[in-house]
Protein backbone atom coordinates (compact mmCIF):
# COMPACT_ATOMS: atom_id res chain seq x y z
CA UNK A 1 0.00 0.00 0.00
CA UNK A 2 1.04 3.61 -0.58
CA UNK A 3 2.52 5.87 2.10
CA UNK A 4 0.10 8.30 3.72
CA UNK A 5 -0.16 11.56 1.79
CA UNK A 6 -1.94 14.92 1.83
CA UNK A 7 -4.91 15.04 -0.55
CA UNK A 8 -7.47 17.61 -1.65
CA UNK A 9 -10.74 16.51 -3.22
CA UNK A 10 -12.08 19.37 -5.33
CA UNK A 11 -15.85 19.07 -5.35
CA UNK A 12 -18.28 18.15 -2.60
CA UNK A 13 -20.89 16.28 -4.62
CA UNK A 14 -21.75 12.64 -4.02
CA UNK A 15 -18.73 11.15 -5.80
CA UNK A 16 -16.21 13.66 -4.47
CA UNK A 17 -17.51 13.06 -0.95
CA UNK A 18 -17.30 9.29 -1.37
CA UNK A 19 -13.71 9.47 -2.63
CA UNK A 20 -12.76 11.78 0.22
CA UNK A 21 -14.25 9.32 2.71
CA UNK A 22 -12.44 6.42 1.03
CA UNK A 23 -9.06 8.17 1.16
CA UNK A 24 -9.56 9.30 4.75
CA UNK A 25 -10.39 5.74 5.77
CA UNK A 26 -7.12 4.74 4.16
CA UNK A 27 -5.33 6.99 6.64
CA UNK A 28 -4.53 9.86 4.27
CA UNK A 29 -4.84 13.52 5.28
CA UNK A 30 -7.86 14.55 3.21
CA UNK A 31 -9.75 17.82 2.83
CA UNK A 32 -12.72 18.32 0.53
CA UNK A 33 -12.90 21.74 -1.08
CA UNK A 34 -16.44 22.91 -1.80
CA UNK A 35 -18.35 26.14 -2.28
CA UNK A 36 -21.17 25.70 0.25
CA UNK A 37 -20.00 26.78 3.69
CA UNK A 38 -23.06 25.26 5.40
CA UNK A 39 -22.37 21.84 3.90
CA UNK A 40 -18.69 22.12 4.87
CA UNK A 41 -19.66 22.87 8.47
CA UNK A 42 -22.05 19.92 8.55
CA UNK A 43 -19.40 17.55 7.21
CA UNK A 44 -16.97 18.75 9.88
CA UNK A 45 -19.46 18.66 12.77
CA UNK A 46 -21.80 15.79 11.93
CA UNK A 47 -19.62 13.80 9.50
CA UNK A 48 -22.35 13.65 6.88
CA UNK A 49 -23.06 15.31 3.53
CA UNK A 50 -26.78 16.06 3.97
CA UNK A 51 -27.24 17.45 0.47
CA UNK A 52 -25.92 14.55 -1.59
CA UNK A 53 -25.55 11.54 0.74
CA UNK A 54 -27.99 12.05 3.61
CA UNK A 55 -27.93 9.48 6.38
CA UNK A 56 -24.58 7.97 5.37
CA UNK A 57 -21.79 8.54 7.92
CA UNK A 58 -18.42 9.84 6.74
CA UNK A 59 -15.04 9.04 8.21
CA UNK A 60 -14.55 11.54 11.06
CA UNK A 61 -11.02 12.26 9.85
CA UNK A 62 -12.40 13.76 6.62
CA UNK A 63 -12.30 17.58 6.73
CA UNK A 64 -14.21 20.02 4.54
CA UNK A 65 -13.39 23.62 3.69
CA UNK A 66 -14.24 26.47 1.35
CA UNK A 67 -10.65 27.76 1.48
CA UNK A 68 -8.98 27.24 -1.94
CA UNK A 69 -5.56 27.09 -0.26
CA UNK A 70 -6.06 23.31 0.10
CA UNK A 71 -5.72 23.04 -3.69
CA UNK A 72 -1.96 23.47 -3.15
CA UNK A 73 -1.71 19.90 -1.86
CA UNK A 74 0.47 17.46 -3.86
CA UNK A 75 -2.49 15.26 -4.88
CA UNK A 76 -5.77 16.78 -6.03
CA UNK A 77 -8.81 14.72 -7.00
CA UNK A 78 -10.94 16.60 -9.54
CA UNK A 79 -14.59 15.83 -8.79
CA UNK A 80 -15.91 18.82 -10.76
CA UNK A 81 -18.57 18.09 -13.44
CA UNK A 82 -17.10 17.95 -16.93
CA UNK A 83 -19.05 20.91 -18.32
CA UNK A 84 -17.84 23.09 -15.43
CA UNK A 85 -14.25 21.86 -15.39
CA UNK A 86 -12.66 24.37 -17.78
CA UNK A 87 -13.95 27.55 -16.11
CA UNK A 88 -13.28 26.06 -12.69
CA UNK A 89 -9.66 25.23 -13.55
CA UNK A 90 -9.14 28.64 -15.14
CA UNK A 91 -10.41 30.32 -11.98
CA UNK A 92 -8.34 28.23 -9.58
CA UNK A 93 -5.12 27.57 -11.51
CA UNK A 94 -3.18 29.96 -9.27
CA UNK A 95 -3.66 27.66 -6.28
CA UNK A 96 -2.08 24.51 -7.74
CA UNK A 97 1.55 23.54 -7.23
CA UNK A 98 3.80 22.95 -10.28
CA UNK A 99 3.95 19.21 -10.95
CA UNK A 100 0.75 18.53 -9.00
CA UNK A 101 -0.74 15.06 -9.38
CA UNK A 102 -4.33 15.33 -10.63
CA UNK A 103 -6.82 12.45 -10.57
CA UNK A 104 -9.92 13.22 -12.59
CA UNK A 105 -13.10 11.61 -11.28
CA UNK A 106 -15.60 13.29 -13.63
CA UNK A 107 -17.18 11.69 -16.68
CA UNK A 108 -18.13 13.52 -19.84
CA UNK A 109 -17.12 15.28 -23.06
CA UNK A 110 -17.14 19.07 -23.17
CA UNK A 111 -19.76 20.51 -25.49
CA UNK A 112 -18.41 22.86 -28.14
CA UNK A 113 -14.76 21.83 -27.96
CA UNK A 114 -15.51 18.06 -27.79
CA UNK A 115 -12.55 17.82 -25.41
CA UNK A 116 -12.05 15.09 -22.83
CA UNK A 117 -11.29 16.03 -19.24
CA UNK A 118 -7.62 15.17 -19.87
CA UNK A 119 -7.51 17.59 -22.80
CA UNK A 120 -9.26 20.33 -20.83
CA UNK A 121 -6.78 19.93 -17.98
CA UNK A 122 -3.78 20.02 -20.31
CA UNK A 123 -5.08 23.18 -21.97
CA UNK A 124 -5.84 25.00 -18.72
CA UNK A 125 -2.97 23.79 -16.49
CA UNK A 126 -0.33 22.79 -19.04
CA UNK A 127 2.10 25.40 -17.73
CA UNK A 128 2.17 23.61 -14.36
CA UNK A 129 3.23 20.32 -15.97
CA UNK A 130 0.73 18.30 -13.93
CA UNK A 131 0.84 14.51 -13.63
CA UNK A 132 -2.59 13.36 -14.78
CA UNK A 133 -4.69 10.27 -14.16
CA UNK A 134 -8.36 9.37 -14.43
CA UNK A 135 -10.41 7.12 -12.16
CA UNK A 136 -13.52 5.49 -13.60
CA UNK A 137 -15.66 2.39 -13.44
CA UNK A 138 -18.93 1.02 -12.00
CA UNK A 139 -19.11 2.84 -8.69
CA UNK A 140 -22.13 4.41 -7.03
CA UNK A 141 -21.08 6.76 -4.24
CA UNK A 142 -23.56 5.36 -1.72
CA UNK A 143 -22.22 1.83 -2.15
CA UNK A 144 -18.68 3.07 -1.52
CA UNK A 145 -19.80 4.71 1.73
CA UNK A 146 -21.49 1.46 2.74
CA UNK A 147 -18.19 -0.39 2.22
CA UNK A 148 -19.73 -2.63 -0.45
CA UNK A 149 -17.14 -4.28 -2.74
CA UNK A 150 -16.28 -2.02 -5.67
CA UNK A 151 -13.73 -2.29 -8.50
CA UNK A 152 -12.57 0.60 -10.70
CA UNK A 153 -9.75 1.42 -13.11
CA UNK A 154 -7.22 4.22 -12.82
CA UNK A 155 -5.50 5.24 -16.05
CA UNK A 156 -2.35 7.30 -16.52
CA UNK A 157 0.06 7.67 -19.42
CA UNK A 158 2.76 7.26 -16.77
CA UNK A 159 2.64 3.55 -15.91
CA UNK A 160 4.56 4.02 -12.65
CA UNK A 161 2.16 6.77 -11.56
CA UNK A 162 -0.78 4.51 -12.29
CA UNK A 163 0.69 1.74 -10.15
CA UNK A 164 1.34 4.19 -7.32
CA UNK A 165 -2.13 5.72 -7.40
CA UNK A 166 -3.92 2.38 -7.47
CA UNK A 167 -2.26 1.73 -4.12
CA UNK A 168 -3.38 5.11 -2.79
CA UNK A 169 -7.03 4.49 -3.62
CA UNK A 170 -7.33 0.74 -2.96
CA UNK A 171 -8.69 -0.55 0.32
CA UNK A 172 -10.44 -3.60 1.79
CA UNK A 173 -13.65 -2.97 -0.18
CA UNK A 174 -12.30 -0.82 -3.03
CA UNK A 175 -10.08 -2.49 -5.64
CA UNK A 176 -8.32 -0.29 -8.16
CA UNK A 177 -6.76 -1.64 -11.35
CA UNK A 178 -4.34 0.42 -13.45
CA UNK A 179 -4.21 1.17 -17.18
CA UNK A 180 -2.33 3.42 -19.58
CA UNK A 181 -5.33 4.01 -21.88
CA UNK A 182 -6.43 7.42 -20.63
CA UNK A 183 -8.49 8.11 -23.77
CA UNK A 184 -10.32 4.79 -23.55
CA UNK A 185 -11.13 5.11 -19.87
CA UNK A 186 -12.42 8.68 -20.27
CA UNK A 187 -14.40 7.86 -23.41
CA UNK A 188 -15.98 4.84 -21.73
CA UNK A 189 -17.05 6.91 -18.75
CA UNK A 190 -18.64 9.52 -21.01
CA UNK A 191 -20.27 7.24 -23.57
CA UNK A 192 -21.96 4.90 -21.11
CA UNK A 193 -24.08 7.80 -19.85
CA UNK A 194 -25.62 8.21 -23.30
CA UNK A 195 -26.41 4.50 -23.42
CA UNK A 196 -27.91 4.65 -19.93
CA UNK A 197 -30.41 7.25 -21.13
CA UNK A 198 -31.29 4.95 -24.03
CA UNK A 199 -31.69 1.92 -21.76
CA UNK A 200 -33.83 3.88 -19.33
CA UNK A 201 -36.05 5.05 -22.17
CA UNK A 202 -36.57 1.45 -23.28
CA UNK A 203 -37.59 0.45 -19.78
CA UNK A 204 -39.76 3.53 -19.38
CA UNK A 205 -41.64 2.44 -22.49
CA UNK A 206 -42.03 -1.06 -21.04
CA UNK A 207 -40.22 -2.75 -23.93
CA UNK A 208 -38.92 -5.63 -21.84
CA UNK A 209 -35.65 -7.33 -20.95
CA UNK A 210 -34.87 -8.44 -24.52
CA UNK A 211 -34.81 -4.83 -25.68
CA UNK A 212 -32.59 -3.74 -22.82
CA UNK A 213 -30.11 -6.57 -23.46
CA UNK A 214 -29.95 -5.74 -27.16
CA UNK A 215 -29.45 -2.06 -26.43
CA UNK A 216 -26.65 -2.66 -23.92
CA UNK A 217 -24.87 -5.01 -26.33
CA UNK A 218 -25.15 -2.74 -29.35
CA UNK A 219 -24.34 0.21 -27.11
CA UNK A 220 -21.04 -1.39 -26.15
CA UNK A 221 -20.19 -1.87 -29.83
CA UNK A 222 -20.99 1.79 -30.52
CA UNK A 223 -18.87 2.91 -27.58
CA UNK A 224 -15.93 0.89 -28.87
CA UNK A 225 -16.25 2.29 -32.41
CA UNK A 226 -16.32 5.86 -31.19
CA UNK A 227 -13.53 5.32 -28.69
CA UNK A 228 -11.19 3.70 -31.19
CA UNK A 229 -11.85 6.52 -33.67
CA UNK A 230 -10.81 8.92 -30.90
CA UNK A 231 -7.56 7.03 -30.23
CA UNK A 232 -8.58 4.52 -27.55
CA UNK A 233 -7.70 0.83 -27.37
CA UNK A 234 -10.65 -1.42 -28.23
CA UNK A 235 -10.04 -3.84 -25.36
CA UNK A 236 -10.49 -1.07 -22.78
CA UNK A 237 -14.23 -1.09 -23.50
CA UNK A 238 -14.46 -4.69 -22.33
CA UNK A 239 -13.16 -3.61 -18.91
CA UNK A 240 -14.48 -1.78 -15.88
CA UNK A 241 -14.68 1.69 -17.47
CA UNK A 242 -16.56 0.28 -20.46
CA UNK A 243 -18.67 -2.84 -20.02
CA UNK A 244 -18.59 -2.58 -16.23
CA UNK A 245 -19.85 0.99 -16.00
CA UNK A 246 -22.27 0.43 -18.90
CA UNK A 247 -23.86 -2.54 -17.14
CA UNK A 248 -24.28 -0.65 -13.88
CA UNK A 249 -25.73 2.55 -15.30
CA UNK A 250 -28.06 0.81 -17.76
CA UNK A 251 -29.62 -1.54 -15.21
CA UNK A 252 -29.68 0.12 -11.77
CA UNK A 253 -32.16 2.84 -10.88
CA UNK A 254 -29.57 4.72 -8.79
CA UNK A 255 -28.15 5.89 -12.13
CA UNK A 256 -29.19 9.49 -12.77
CA UNK A 257 -28.84 9.04 -16.52
CA UNK A 258 -31.00 5.92 -16.48
CA UNK A 259 -33.55 7.90 -14.45
CA UNK A 260 -33.64 10.56 -17.17
CA UNK A 261 -34.39 7.87 -19.75
CA UNK A 262 -37.03 6.15 -17.61
CA UNK A 263 -38.92 9.39 -17.15
CA UNK A 264 -38.62 10.35 -20.82
CA UNK A 265 -40.04 6.94 -21.75
CA UNK A 266 -42.96 7.55 -19.39
CA UNK A 267 -43.77 10.83 -21.10
CA UNK A 268 -42.14 13.49 -18.92
CA UNK A 269 -40.47 16.53 -20.46
CA UNK A 270 -36.70 16.86 -20.27
CA UNK A 271 -36.79 20.32 -18.67
CA UNK A 272 -38.94 19.08 -15.79
CA UNK A 273 -36.75 15.99 -15.31
CA UNK A 274 -33.47 17.90 -15.12
CA UNK A 275 -34.94 20.52 -12.76
CA UNK A 276 -36.24 17.88 -10.35
CA UNK A 277 -33.19 15.59 -10.28
CA UNK A 278 -31.20 17.75 -7.87
CA UNK A 279 -27.92 16.37 -9.24
CA UNK A 280 -26.04 16.52 -12.53
CA UNK A 281 -26.95 13.93 -15.18
CA UNK A 282 -23.86 14.32 -17.37
CA UNK A 283 -25.33 12.20 -20.16
CA UNK A 284 -27.73 14.93 -21.27
CA UNK A 285 -25.01 17.34 -22.38
CA UNK A 286 -22.59 14.56 -23.27
CA UNK A 287 -25.12 13.27 -25.81
CA UNK A 288 -24.87 16.52 -27.78
CA UNK A 289 -21.07 16.39 -27.72
CA UNK A 290 -20.90 12.71 -28.73
CA UNK A 291 -23.45 13.25 -31.51
CA UNK A 292 -21.29 16.02 -32.97
CA UNK A 293 -18.12 13.97 -32.47
CA UNK A 294 -19.59 10.98 -34.30
CA UNK A 295 -20.48 13.18 -37.26
CA UNK A 296 -17.01 14.71 -37.40
CA UNK A 297 -15.29 11.33 -37.10
CA UNK A 298 -17.78 9.75 -39.55
CA UNK A 299 -18.57 6.95 -37.12
CA UNK A 300 -21.92 5.17 -37.29
CA UNK A 301 -23.64 5.88 -33.96
CA UNK A 302 -27.36 5.04 -34.24
CA UNK A 303 -28.03 4.88 -30.50
CA UNK A 304 -26.38 8.24 -29.86
CA UNK A 305 -28.38 9.68 -32.76
CA UNK A 306 -31.58 8.25 -31.29
CA UNK A 307 -30.96 9.70 -27.83
CA UNK A 308 -30.01 13.04 -29.39
CA UNK A 309 -33.31 13.08 -31.29
CA UNK A 310 -35.28 12.50 -28.09
CA UNK A 311 -33.34 15.05 -26.02
CA UNK A 312 -32.78 17.84 -28.50
CA UNK A 313 -35.35 17.43 -31.29
CA UNK A 314 -38.28 16.45 -29.07
CA UNK A 315 -38.83 13.30 -31.08
CA UNK A 316 -41.25 10.82 -29.52
CA UNK A 317 -39.39 7.91 -27.88
CA UNK A 318 -41.65 5.20 -29.39
CA UNK A 319 -41.02 6.59 -32.88
CA UNK A 320 -37.27 6.82 -32.38
CA UNK A 321 -36.99 3.26 -31.09
CA UNK A 322 -39.19 1.94 -33.90
CA UNK A 323 -36.86 3.63 -36.37
CA UNK A 324 -33.90 1.85 -34.76
CA UNK A 325 -35.55 -1.52 -35.33
CA UNK A 326 -36.32 -0.62 -38.95
CA UNK A 327 -32.69 0.09 -39.90
CA UNK A 328 -31.15 -1.90 -42.74
CA UNK A 329 -30.08 -5.39 -41.71
CA UNK A 330 -26.34 -6.04 -41.49
CA UNK A 331 -23.70 -8.34 -40.07
CA UNK A 332 -23.10 -8.03 -36.34
Curated annotation (Swiss-Prot):
Positions that bind NADPH: 14-15, 35, 107, 141, 256, 280, 282
Keyword check for Signal: no
Keywords: Cytoplasm, Lipid biosynthesis, Lipid metabolism, NAD, NADP, Nucleotide-binding, Oxidoreductase, Phospholipid biosynthesis, Phospholipid metabolism
Active site per database record: 192 (proton acceptor)
Record GO terms (molecular function): glycerol-3-phosphate dehydrogenase [NAD(P)+] activity; NAD binding
Stored InterPro entries: 6-PGluconate_DH-like_C_sf, 6PGD_dom2, G3P_DH_NAD-dep, G3P_DH_NAD-dep_C, G3P_DH_NAD-dep_N, NAD(P)-bd_dom_sf
Binding site for sn-glycerol 3-phosphate: 107, 137, 139, 192, 245, 255-257
Entry's Gene Ontology cellular component terms: cytosol
Pathway membership, UniProt: Membrane lipid metabolism; glycerophospholipid metabolism
Record localization: Cytoplasm
Broad class of enzyme this protein falls into: oxidoreductase
E.C. code: 1.1.1.94
Catalytic reaction annotation: sn-glycerol 3-phosphate + NAD(+) = dihydroxyacetone phosphate + NADH + H(+); sn-glycerol 3-phosphate + NADP(+) = dihydroxyacetone phosphate + NADPH + H(+)
UniProt-listed GO biological process terms: carbohydrate metabolic process; glycerol-3-phosphate biosynthetic process; glycerol-3-phosphate catabolic process; glycerophospholipid metabolic process; phospholipid biosynthetic process
PANTHER family to which the protein is assigned, alphabetical: GLYCEROL-3-PHOSPHATE DEHYDROGENASE (PTHR11728), GLYCEROL-3-PHOSPHATE DEHYDROGENASE [NAD(+)] 2, CHLOROPLASTIC (PTHR11728:SF1)
Similarity annotation: Belongs to the NAD-dependent glycerol-3-phosphate dehydrogenase family.
Role played: Catalyzes the reduction of the glycolytic intermediate dihydroxyacetone phosphate (DHAP) to sn-glycerol 3-phosphate (G3P), the key precursor for phospholipid synthesis.
Stated name of the protein: Glycerol-3-phosphate dehydrogenase [NAD(P)+]
Organism: Desulfovibrio desulfuricans (strain ATCC 27774 / DSM 6949 / MB)
